[in-house]
């Protein structure tokens, strides 16, 4: 009919990250459920994968996590406490732990047992189903109530040791220094 079509949606760049070494965008941005004018992005721009808070115009407001460790996964959001639940290896490279990070960048560990933790967050963000293992302990599943100042943990399952009754090797984890004596 001769009427020019107007696009229903317009697109524009929200944020652009460049590096002369390497950029690998692996994780989508996540808008805060309690404030749709802000989003969280994971980036390795400081050498480690960390969380950054941005406004809706793409302006960086704050680096929420920092240090010589890696945010491995953004598990979800606790809307009541306005915090982000993450899995990270902050304490030790072999221990994947669960943390709550508030908008000031303050972190609180949500469980106290060493191991590799994998968690699912409830829709309300108040409960975690935390499944973890260690080389010497079979699978454990806990329900963690993170709505309190100190998380409350209830055991849901502790698997029987499938190797009970067998002679087992001794498991040890350690570090070996490189030629520079540091790493």
Describe the function of each predicted region:
Residues 1, 9-20, 24-28, 72-76, ...:
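Non-catalytic accessory segments flanking enzyme active sites
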Residues 13, 50-66:
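Polyanionic (Asp/Glu-rich) segments that form extended negatively charged tracts
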Residues 50-52, 97-99, 140-142:
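A short loop-to-beta-strand structural motif that recurs across blades of beta-propeller domains
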Residues 18, 43, 58, 68, ...:
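Short, flexible loop/turn elements at secondary-structure junctions
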Residues 47, 57, 70, 115:
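A generic "binding-loop/recognition-motif" signal
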């Amino acid at each position: 009919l001769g009427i020019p079509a107007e696009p229903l949606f317009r697109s524009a760049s929200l944020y652009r990250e460049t590096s002369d070494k390497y950029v690998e965008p692996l994780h989508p941005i996540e808008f805060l459920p309690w404030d749709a004018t802000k989003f969280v992005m994971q980036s390795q721009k400081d050498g480690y994968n960390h969380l950054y808070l941005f406004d809706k115009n793409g302006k960086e407001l704050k680096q929420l996590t920092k240090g010589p460790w890696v945010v491995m996964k953004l598990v979800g959001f606790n809307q009541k406490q306005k915090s982000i639940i993450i899995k990270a290896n902050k304490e030790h490279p072999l221990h994947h732990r669960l943390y709550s990070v508030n908008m000031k960048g303050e972190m609180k560990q949500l469980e106290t047992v060493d191991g590799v933790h994998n968690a699912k967050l409830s829709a309300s963000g108040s409960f975690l189903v935390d499944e973890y293992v260690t080389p010497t302990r079979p699978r454990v599943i806990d329900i963690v109530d993170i709505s309190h100042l100190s998380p409350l943990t209830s055991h849901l399952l502790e698997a029987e040791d499938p190797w009970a009754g067998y002679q087992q090797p001794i498991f040890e984890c350690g570090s070996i220094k490189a030629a520079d004596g540091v790493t």
